[in-house]
UniProtKB/Swiss-Prot annotation:
Pathway: Amino-acid biosynthesis; L-methionine biosynthesis via de novo pathway; O-acetyl-L-homoserine from L-homoserine: step 1/1. The lineage of its organism: Bacteria, Pseudomonadati, Thermodesulfobacteriota, Desulfuromonadia, Desulfuromonadales. The active site is at 153 (nucleophile), 316, 349. Keywords: Acyltransferase, Amino-acid biosynthesis, Cytoplasm, Methionine biosynthesis, Transferase. Its EC number is 2.3.1.31. It is found in: Cytoplasm. InterPro entries: AB_hydrolase_1 (IPR000073), AB_hydrolase_fold (IPR029058), HAT_MetX-like (IPR008220). This is Homoserine O-acetyltransferase. It catalyses: L-homoserine + acetyl-CoA = O-acetyl-L-homoserine + CoA. Transfers an acetyl group from acetyl-CoA to L-homoserine, forming acetyl-L-homoserine. One of its GO terms (molecular function) is homoserine O-acetyltransferase activity. Transmembrane segments: none annotated. GO terms for cellular component: cytoplasm. It comes from Syntrophotalea carbinolica (strain DSM 2380 / NBRC 103641 / GraBd1) (Pelobacter carbinolicus). One of its GO terms (biological process) is homoserine metabolic process.
Length: 372
């Protein structure tokens, strides 16, 4: 059995100050952040690493909450004794983003000004707002700086924003399978997912009861999103053109294996994620542009003062390699130390979760060059 961080607990911290959002609105206090930590702080509190999660992730990145848990945290392959993010060396933190439903303040939370759940009265948030909330946690933990901020997909956006927003705090950033701004195609896919939810009569304009969510709409919305995480090659390998039951081939409702998989994946998602949180995070993804409130991407990226390590995946069509390459090229033209590794993989956008062994040695080498 591989080394593990063992049994872990999700913690919660409430912050008393309101949070001014990029929209200009205030997110009212108390603002809760759910987080987990792995490993121990060193004497001068200089060994902290922040892990940032993707769209439907949470703070539970490694270990298990109980011995009976079927699966460990979502990045357990990466975090633990002797692993890439070595908990014998680093103090690793992962927090749930605001706007989500994993314990941090989001649309399911109680609005302190009304005493009722926010639902759609929750303000629209941006990735930059998520990062500002995370900075409060890092300050609460009394970490003067971070060795790195590392994450994939939406986590890569957060890592990049850390470099732009808090250049004096981060000593490096590692964006994986990310982009500098969300493309029209990615926005279009999210629009379809939204419409699937809006067309479910149980959605009730976001005022559904938790025990009666818009299950059909959320399942379909998730399935639409999930397709973009895969690739043509991985779907051929996993499903081919196989039917789930041969005698259903000429049954009008007979299913290919890929159909059954999408249906199962969507239905399983209902039990672990809130619909409004799904919508709010999709909106945050759509709005993402590192140049927001700057005159250009160059002006935003010139704020980064630390080395960066970038990974893309050849079959990722959600955030194609060229999108991250554009950011790396700008950084290098600005004289910033930006290291880039395009990874050959057939697993699409999810390659960073499926085949970490293809890029982790680069992370180890990169971290070894940094001072802890």
């Amino acid at each position: 059995m591989e080394p593990s961080v063992g049994i872990v607990k999700t913690r919660h911290i409430d912050f008393n100050g309101d949070l001014r959002l990029e929209s200009g609105r205030l997110l009212a206090a108390p603002i809760t952040l759910a987080y987990e930590t792995y490993g121990q702080l060193n004497a001068d509190r200089s060994n902290g690493i922040l892990v940032t999660h993707a769209w439907t992730g949470d703070a539970h990145a490694a270990g298990r909450h109980t011995p009976e848990d079927r699966k460990p945290g979502w990045w357990d392959d990466m975090i633990g004794p002797g692993k890439v993010l070595d908990t014998n060396r680093y103090f690793v933190i992962c927090s749930n983003v605001i706007g989500s439903c994993g314990g941090s303040t989001g649309p399911t939370s109680i609005n302190p000004r009304t005493g009722r759940p926010y639902n759609l009265s929750f303000p629209v948030i941006m990735v930059r707002d998520m990062v500002r909330a995370q900075k409060r946690l890092i300050d609460h933990l009394d970490l003067p700086s971070l060795v790195t901020v590392i994450g994939g997909s939406m986590g890569a956006m957060q890592a990049l924003e850390w470099g732009v927003l808090f250049p004096d705090t981060v000593r490096s950033i590692i964006p994986i399978a990310g982009t500098g701004r969300t493309s029209p195609m990615a926005i279009a896919l999210n629009a379809l997912a939204r419409q699937a939810i809006f067309n479910d009569p149980m959605w009730k304009k976001g005022n559904y009861r938790p025990e009666h969510p818009p299950a059909d709409g959320l399942a379909l919305g998730r399935a639409i999103g999930h397709i973009s995480f895969l690739s043509n090659a991985s779907m051929h390998l996993k499903f081919g053109r196989r039917f789930s039951a041969r005698d259903g081939m000429f049954d009008f409702f007979g299913q290919f294996e890929v159909e059954r998989y999408l249906e199962y994946n969507g239905r399983a998602f209902i039990d672990r994620f809130d619909t409004n949180a799904f919508l709010y995070l999709a909106k945050a993804l759509d709005l993402y542009d590192v140049a927001w409130n700057y005159d250009s991407r160059e002006q935003a990226l010139d704020r980064i003062q630390c080395p960066s390590l970038w990974f893309t995946f050849s079959s990722d069509w959600l955030y194609p390699p060229q999108e991250a390459e554009d950011i790396v090229n700008i950084l290098q033209k600005l004289g910033k130390p930006a290291e880039y590794h395009p990874i050959q993989s057939d697993y699409g956008h999810d390659s960073f979760l499926v085949e970490p062994e293809k890029f982790t040695h680069h992370i180890t080498e990169f971290l070894n060059r940094l001072t802890v």
